[in-house]
């Protein structure tokens, strides 16, 4: 069977002028991930990453930690949704800077509004548009893995949660799918690995959010 490993990017720079840059911890998480995968004899036939700086930097750190020379392909289908746009579109979002705890509270309320699908015109990318492109990206990566290859995908928590929710309950209605996504999205660890196996009956979720290479201060969610 083919294998697709979905990797969340390392810790980005929350609260800085440019979130889309790995922190020092994020770089270390990427290197630790690469070393851990190499120790387990993972040898990817292809590395795919989203088209964001944090995806590129995580891929660079992972490749360095693993000592891989795999080809890297960019697929914007694995990009994160515009989380700041979603938060900013919520009418009750406070003005001014928010600390991590307050931002998380506002983020969860704002994403619930977004996933409800009742205000699609308020967002540059609607919830159906986001989930549709992620499912298409997952299909591409599974096809690239083929019957016996290994594709490592560097993405973000939102797309990984969307792909995982779709695989866990393919027949879920829109509301149930959104609820499952919300639960999964809040717990995806930086540089964690979610494993998808690809067989004759299609892709199946094998594991979600593996992170044994992390401990102490290297274990982060934001």
Model-inferred region functions:
Residues 49-50, 132, 154-155:
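Short beta-strand scaffold positions
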Residues 65-135:
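Phosphate-handling substructures
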């Amino acid at each position: 069977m083919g294998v697709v490993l979905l990797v969340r990017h390392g810790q980005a720079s929350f609260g800085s002028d440019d979130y889309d840059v790995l922190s020092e911890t994020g770089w270390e998480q990427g290197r630790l991930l690469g070393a851990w995968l190499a120790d387990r004899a993972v040898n990817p036939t292809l590395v795919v990453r989203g088209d964001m700086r944090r995806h590129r930097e995580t891929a660079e750190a992972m490749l360095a930690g693993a000592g891989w020379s795999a080809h890297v392909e960019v697929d914007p289908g694995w990009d994160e949704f515009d989380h700041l746009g979603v938060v900013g579109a919520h009418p009750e979002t406070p003005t001014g800077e928010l600390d991590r705890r307050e931002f998380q509270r506002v983020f969860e309320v704002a994403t619930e509004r977004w996933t409800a699908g009742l205000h699609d015109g308020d967002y540059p990318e609607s919830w159906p548009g986001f989930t549709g492109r992620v499912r298409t990206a997952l299909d591409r990566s599974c096809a690239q893995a083929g019957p016996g290859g290994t594709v490592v995908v560097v993405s973000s928590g939102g797309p990984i949660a969307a792909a995982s929710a779709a695989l866990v309950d393919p027949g879920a209605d829109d509301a149930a799918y959104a609820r499952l996504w919300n639960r999964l999205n809040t717990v995806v660890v930086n540089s964690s690995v979610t494993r998808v196996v690809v067989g004759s009956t299609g892709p199946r979720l094998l594991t979600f959010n593996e992170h044994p290479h992390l401990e102490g201060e290297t274990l982060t969610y934001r």
